[in-house]
Amino acid sequence: MSAPGMDKRKLSTSGDSLYEILGLPKTATGDDIKKTYRKLALKYHPDKNPDNVDAADKFKEVNRAHSILSNQTKRNIYDNYGSLGLYIAEQFGEENVNAYFVVTSPAVKAVVICCAVITGCCCCCCCCCCCNFCCGKFKPPVNESHDQYSHLNRPDGNREGNDMPTHLGQPPRLEDVDLDDVNLGAGGAPVTSQPREQAGGQPVFAMPPPSGAVGVNPFTGAPVAANENTSLNTTEQTTYTPDMVNQKY
């Protein structure tokens, strides 16, 4: 009957049993713990009680209480989380005790339960990450503009006929034509001559040379036959205002 009670007391979260063993309050200082431990150790030492089994057990409990309460880190864990905190510190480390109790707190559990209910036990995450929308069957379409340039990195260098853009019977635009698909001839030779007139095409007419253009000097009003050597001003004097040419001073 004592073993279940001992296990239950060790895993308590109150943090009072070790202080009760030493007969001290939780506000006791380190010196008070040392003095009380020495008195109880001398009182229940096995050498003074050779045939007393209860005294031996009491001596073990006093030693355990002193080893925990004399360590400031373990004492803080015990004061906050009781014997259960000491057990968690032995399993996961003293630095992870606070994180363990935060994760297992009722508030965090309530948030997890609410998220599970809203998402249908995280069914949305499973469909997106694990099942990939039924092996890609219901996967959202990718950006369509990406497919327009997919032929640039194809391994065979040729595009199938169904990959060419359709323009309702019109010839493809220059920007839509793949330059790699243009045939340079039957033997692959480069083009060295201009294209000739095809049969049934429009006739070509030679245009006469342009006649000599006759202009008017804007400053003098005299007619001028303009050519490539004609200047805008036929006089050598630089004139900035036409009205001032005939002005007398």
Curated annotation (Swiss-Prot):
The keyword Chaperone applies. The modification Phosphothreonine is found at residue 13. One of its GO terms (biological process) is regulation of neuromuscular synaptic transmission. The modification Phosphotyrosine is found at residue 19. Fatty acylated. Heavily palmitoylated in the cysteine string motif. Residues 15-84 form the J domain. Its main location: membrane. Disulfide bonds: none annotated. Expressed in wide range of synaptic terminals: embryonic nervous system, larval neuromuscular junctions, adult visual system (neuropil of optic ganglia and terminal of R1-8 photoreceptors) and thoracic neuromuscular junctions. Also expressed in non-neuronal cells: follicle cells, spermatheca, testis and ejaculatory bulb. Low level of expression is found in many neuronal and non-neuronal tissues. The modification Phosphoserine is found at residues 12, 14, 17. Coiled coil: none annotated. GO terms for cellular component: plasma membrane; synaptic vesicle; terminal bouton; type Ib terminal bouton; type Is terminal bouton. Pfam families: DnaJ (PF00226). It is found in: Membrane. Residues 146-162 have a biased composition (Basic and acidic residues). The keyword Phosphoprotein applies. Residues 146-177, 218-249 are annotated as: Disordered. Keywords: Chaperone, Lipoprotein, Membrane, Palmitate, Phosphoprotein. PROSITE patterns: DNAJ_1, DNAJ_2. Residues 227-241 have a biased composition (Polar residues). It is a lipid-anchor. May have an important role in presynaptic function. This is DnaJ homolog subfamily C member 5 homolog. The lineage of its organism: Eukaryota, Metazoa, Ecdysozoa, Arthropoda, Hexapoda.
